Amino acid sequence: MKPDIASTLASLKDFQRATVDYVFERLWLAEDQVKRFLVADEVGLGKTMVAKGVIARTVEHLWDTDKRIDIVYICSNSQIARQNLGRLNVVKGFEVRHADRLTLLPKVTQSLRDQRVNFVSFTPGTSFQVGSSGGAYAERVLLYWMLAACWGAAVTGAAY
């Protein structure tokens, strides 16, 4: 079901609505469009609400032309991401997916094909830090099966 943009936008304060309109204009309508936009403000001034408004306007804008709309949410930590994803979901009835680690996204991508609107989140602390760790167990299992599928045989771990 198409999101109720009017109720989403009506819940915003005037300065939040002005920000939503400006961001949407720059992302989708301006002659000199941008591909990304950072909204930075003091704690408690409604950045999440602004994001919800931008998402609502974007989903409405793409609804008639795109078969699938993917919303990717990058947040400072996993707990906040899980909390905010429910708030950002402007299309009720669509499941929110959270991939704790970027490398685990393939575990949820198959189900993304079945939905019109998808919400996926990542957290930099788990997705984007590179170190000497072997990664999470689930990552190693996923990589094993991906390599096995590519090579058409069981991966033994033996040196080649």
Predicted regions and their residues:
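Extended charged low-complexity segments that act as oligomerization/scaffolding linkers
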Residues: 1-160
